[in-house]
């Protein structure tokens, strides 16, 4: 007897907009998808900003999209999680951060706040630094010093003065905190073991040695006169009465407030590792806190926001209930339907089979917009005929990968290819009396023109994505959904109760 499979097709980068210019989705000849929209229930889902745990107005991406779909709940990204905890007030009770506070109190020592002084939101956010300064004030810590790393990459190249003045005004108003050093991120945030760069930053922060200035702005302006933009500002020590304002010493507390790990590891190791061979330096006895987990092998470190383990993701829960599942995609999106869909877990669940179709070897995908969608489809049809699987997760990479090239005609061809493949799969699923859900993880190829400049746009969008429900017994769908609502919908079709960890809600009315 044939199983009634529940098949989720993720058309990567297939968003929806009413705009016609630069819209490869609406321009493509796609009889199958058009027919599905006429004949079957469909709705739109939020796939960007707060709907997927990102800051408001931030475009979605494939990692975040698959994480949210697979988790069946909004998965807050580090930036949003920390910002939310400040506004909710939990931040001020954070155990790791309060260890730094208690140590400074107990030893009458200094609290040092290190990180990228920027609203860029890629590695850090200036608002998180303000949260730390506020915490120090609330807990009555008197000696608070900022070691400010200057950005110039995720924000304009010479914009640091604005952020220095912003934080200095904030510290004056709140009544605690001073900037002790400034360093361009080129030195402070290396990630390629260029220890000679890191050492210059270390020397300023720990030894009080480097370029000298009477204020942070003075140090910055000197750098500008030497034609060095923010990123390349030489590590500089701010003096008070001819001496460094502050340097990291034994028994001090350090909080590194970058949330993205890759460029925060090296300086952390240089300051805090007991055994270190990057350059010669003394070992310090510190209370050292990192905003997120920079590396699981770091010792003597407290983590303020440790990684969350997502229990009962869709794949794990279906597996626990004895069901069989298949994940299938070509190379470009294989990690997304496996690792990210499973909440950042590499190991397959029990009863989870995986099929990887190699992506074509071309320089850019506009040269082969069909990619290997036909091979993915053929392989899936074969597997469906085995009548083994209760659930299938499939990704077509074309609308996203070809959308990124900015070549409109190629993106159109990509959509047409996917339409052909969707048609074949839907027919097979209906033949087996199964259900096909068709959606996307984020937008891209529906908006290939930057409307403000008229130039090609290669980025993702903040547009909603479709959700189509194809079966011999389709029911009505509600409006106002988001990606996290897909897993509960699929579970309903599989007659499985939703686990308590899933906070998404079924889209079926």
From Swiss-Prot:
Binding site for Mn(2+) 1: 400, 404, 460
Pfam family, one: Metalloenzyme
Active site: 62
Positions of substrate binding: 123, 153-154, 185, 191, 260-263, 333
GO biological process: glucose catabolic process; glycolytic process
Keyword terms of this UniProt record: Glycolysis, Isomerase, Manganese, Metal-binding
Catalytic activity: (2R)-2-phosphoglycerate = (2R)-3-phosphoglycerate
First-level EC class: isomerase
EC nos: 5.4.2.12
Coiled coil: none
Cofactor(s) it depends on: Mn(2+)
Disulfide bond annotation, renumbered to this chain: none
HAMAP family: GpmI
Function: Catalyzes the interconversion of 2-phosphoglycerate and 3-phosphoglycerate.
Family per similarity comment: Belongs to the BPG-independent phosphoglycerate mutase family.
Protein name: 2,3-bisphosphoglycerate-independent phosphoglycerate mutase
Annotated organism of origin: Clostridium botulinum (strain Langeland / NCTC 10281 / Type F)
Organism phylogeny: Bacteria, Bacillati, Bacillota, Clostridia, Eubacteriales
